From Swiss-Prot:
Disulfide bonds: none annotated. It comes from Methylibium petroleiphilum (strain ATCC BAA-1232 / LMG 22953 / PM1). This is tRNA (guanine-N(1)-)-methyltransferase. GO terms for cellular component: cytosol. Belongs to the RNA methyltransferase TrmD family.
Length: 256
């Protein structure tokens, strides 16, 4: 799949492609990441891509025309390569929250054009003309859209075949089934004399059905205590079994 990123700071993406698990996605060609600098499409000697907002106020606004020319270059390059015409995504506080379900949907598509805003934002006319979807990482403000773009590409890349050593790993991630992940343990079995410092006995039992049950119950308990909204969503989507519901009802002080 292919991501085209419109960014004033393409240098932020270079280290990301060379390290970690997702490096395999770029080396194998599972992910093709193309970076487009809007300044290259400015029509002035200073390569200026921003100006003061009409109506006054602080900060600067990214101009429509350099972004439109950059997007046109993306479309020309896609056509020349025989690539699909992908949707335009903008990272914005006004966007819908980026969820694992949306990531999974994107992972099965041809890719996207990612627009990284800066300054006070992007001229609304570019958004109205070209943006297909707005996404947000949460209710907080970043300096630009580059970090959300990196987060999205990372989340999608790790779902591509061959990127993770164990292809079942992502199936046990938090949110993959609508719930938070269960706790994990490794060596040594005991860190101290206290019972709380040991690995839960069920995980050492070798009884696969009991281990699966323990993990499911820990998922349910952790999600119910930390993110009850996810329990409500899973229930509404029919993701909870009768056994899940019985266990949730047995948890003290939650009122689920």
């Amino acid at each position: 799949m292919r991501f085209d990123v419109l960014t004033l700071f393409p240098e932020l993406f270079a280290p990301f492609q060379a390290v970690g698990v997702t490096r395999r996605a770029f080396e194998s060609g599972a992910i093709d990441l193309k970076l487009w600098q809007p300044r290259d499409f400015a029509d002035n000697a200073y390569r200026r891509v921003d100006d003061r907002p009409y109506g006054g106020g602080p900060g600067m606004v990214m101009l429509v025309e350099p972004l439109e020319r950059a997007l046109a270059a993306v479309r020309d390059d896609q056509a020349a390569a025989g690539a699909a015409r992908t949707p335009v995504l903008l990272f914005s506080p006004a966007g819908a929250p980026l969820t694992q379900r949306r990531v999974e949907a994107l992972a099965s598509e041809a890719g996207a054009v990612l627009v990284c805003g800066r300054y006070e934002g992007i001229d609304q006319r570019f958004i109205d003309r070209h943006v297909d979807e707005e996404l947000s990482l949460g209710d907080f403000v970043l300096s630009g859209g580059e970090l959300p773009a990196l987060a999205l590409v990372d989340a999608v890349a790790r779902l591509q075949p061959g990127v993770l050593n164990d292809q079942t790993s992502h199936q046990q991630d938090s949110f993959s089934d609508g719930l938070l992940d269960c706790p994990h343990y490794s060596r040594p079995e005991h860190l101290g004399d206290a019972a709380a410092d040991g690995v839960p006995a069920t995980l050492m039992s070798g009884h696969h059905a009991e281990i699966a049950r323990w993990r499911r119950e820990r998922q349910l308990e952790l999600t119910a205590r930390r993110r009850p909204d996810l329990i409500a969503a899973a229930r509404a989507q029919g993701r909870l079994t009768k056994a899940d519901e019985r266990y949730l009802q047995s948890l003290p002080g939650l009122g689920l």
